[in-house]
Amino acid sequence: MRVLALDSSGIVASVAVVEDDILVAEYTVNYKKTHSQTLLPMLDEIVKMTELDLKTIDAIAVAKGPGSFTGLRIGSATAKGLGLALDKPLVGIPTVEALAYNLYDVNGLICPIMDARRKQVYTGIYRYEDHRLMTVKDQMAVGIEELLSMLNDMGEAVTFLGDGVPVFKDIIADKLTVPFSFAPAHLSRQRAGAVGALGVLYYKEGRTETAAEHKPVSYTHLTLPTR
């Protein structure tokens, strides 16, 4: 099956085409341009380079949040427009889950962190079991120190990734008592290839929605842990 994937949930803009277990093309830009300037030209370039007939895709996978309010709405509007025009289903992928999928089969806990300002992060905690990504703690918004306290209580090694790493690197080093590491540059930000790969899995599990049904996840929809 063939999935077109979009991620504009953060500073990074990314577009990809995934066919079953093959990443056909991926275009990712992490630069000071707005997604309204980059996303559609990137999509157009991928379509041209791969000679893709958009009518042949089976679904559109899109990072549904959390993340940048404006970025999410640009990605959502693009995906919804394509879904309506092509009469194709959408597959909404949690942003932090797609980030965790970048670190396929890594040992220990995986903790994507996206800077939500005011010492808060959008995050979730994951691990791999039998080559499958498992959720340890659901997607949530939480203070960075509270997150680090959770991880200390779990007592396991953890790998961090996401745009929150450069913001909170020092406090992680200061407060965390368990072994930790940071993902390398090529895996540390949003990638539409991961969104597309998860989109294939979700589609096969029947986890699709219509363009009319799709809504990005905002901060108010996230779980706030009890203090």
Task: Tell where the protein language model's regions lie, with residue ranges.
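N-terminal beta-alpha supersecondary unit
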Residues: M1-K64, R189
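Short glycine-aspartate micro-motif
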Residues: V3-A5, A61, G71, I110-I113
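Conserved hydrophobic/aromatic positions in well-ordered beta-strands
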Residues: A16, Y122-Y126, V217
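Surface "functional belts" at beta-alpha junctions
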Residues: I22, P89-S188
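DPxDG-like acidic metal-binding loop motif
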Residues: A61-L90, T95
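Glycine-rich phosphate-binding/hydrolytic loop that grips phosphoryl groups
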Residues: P184-S218
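Conserved small/polar residues in nucleotide/adenosyl-binding loops
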Residues: T220-T226
